[in-house]
Amino acid sequence: MAGTICFIMWVLFITDTVWSRSVRQVYEVHDSDDWTIHDFECPMECFCPPSFPTALYCENRGLKEIPAIPSRIWYLYLQNNLIETIPEKPFENATQLRWINLNKNKITNYGIEKGALSQLKKLLFLFLEDNELEEVPSPLPRSLEQLQLARNKVSRIPQGTFSNLENLTLLDLQNNKLVDNAFQRDTFKGLKNLMQLNMAKNALRNMPPRLPANTMQLFLDNNSIEGIPENYFNVIPKVAFLRLNHNKLSDEGLPSRGFDVSSILDLQLSHNQLTKVPRISAHLQHLHLDHNKIKSVNVSVICPSPSMLPAERDSFSYGPHLRYLRLDGNEIKPPIPMALMTCFRLLQAVII
């Protein structure tokens, strides 16, 4: 029970690390010098709540153009409109913007005027989900910490797109049209602080190359990935949450050491083509292997031997840390091998 609580706290810590710095900056006390308290100009197309003078609500209004943004605005909500372009002019005075939501519009790359976004020197959050983008927009402000581009038509990432985005911690590219040739060896160069990368629901057949070294959460579900190169995880030594559900991974496509990577705490390999349980690290806590083609569990292969346990033996006095194991949807039949329970003494749930 204590171990599960520790794991949950660790998950919360990681999530907080990705979000909290941005959230603190977004919700910090506003400096009265940033805007004049008597200046409550509000575009007629939008709503400016008196109790929240730094927010501008223009969502769900059938807008085709972005109105002029007053200088006091920090939070801009323009989602669910008919906007096709992002010109520079409406943002001329919007020097304090931290948050822009442009989800569910009709924005194309050709419609984004160069400099329109990069001029926003304090912008932290940019939401452009459910638009018509075919490549990651550029240039973007160096200050940006979260970029949400899910459900577009992105198939290209121009060279140098991320070169100045050293503050970016979260990049969401799920449900786009990315294929393997969208990536070069230096595609992610510049993302020194990226912690969460989501490229689920694309058309990848290979693992993306040279990911940022600080990546902790990597989501690649619902692609067509067939294999993982040897030593692939050496480049991302901090990865803790790895999701590869709904791919085409086979036993032959895995590295020789499997997933024996000490940083990985949560590993999801559901709905693949595995016939064996891969090697895992003694640190791993959650393992999802449901809906594969596994017929039996060879405990002697997957159980870390005493020599494989980390030097910090106190935390491993009860053996490996595995607590949750899903094996349902395979060809395994009960009962659970007793050797499995003997090896993984902290197991709290096994689903067959």
From Swiss-Prot:
Signal peptide positions on this chain: 1-20
SMART domains: LRR_BAC (SM00364), LRR_TYP (SM00369), LRRNT (SM00013)
Cystine connections: 42-48, 46-58, 303-343
LRR repeats: 72-93, 96-117, 122-142, 143-164, 167-180, 193-213, 214-235, 238-258, 263-282, 283-304
Entry keywords, A to Z: Disease variant, Disulfide bond, Extracellular matrix, Glycoprotein, Leucine-rich repeat, Proteoglycan, Repeat, Secreted, Sensory transduction, Signal, Vision
Tissue-specificity statement: Cornea (at protein level). Increased expression in the stroma of keratoconus corneas. Also detected in trachea, and in low levels, in intestine, skeletal muscle, ovary, lung and putamen.
GO terms for biological process, alphabetical: cornea development in camera-type eye; visual perception
InterPro entries tied to this protein: Leu-rich_rpt, Leu-rich_rpt_typical-subtyp, LRR_dom_sf, LRRNT, SLRP
PROSITE patterns, sorted: LRR
Main location: secreted
Subcellular localization(s) per the UniProt record: Secreted, Extracellular space, Extracellular matrix
SUPFAM superfamilies: L domain-like
Boundaries of every LRRNT domain copy: 33-71
Function per UniProt: May be important in developing and maintaining corneal transparency and for the structure of the stromal matrix.
Family, per entry: Belongs to the small leucine-rich proteoglycan (SLRP) family. SLRP class II subfamily.
Record protein name field: Keratocan
Organism for this UniProt entry: Homo sapiens (Human)
Source lineage: Eukaryota, Metazoa, Chordata, Craniata, Vertebrata
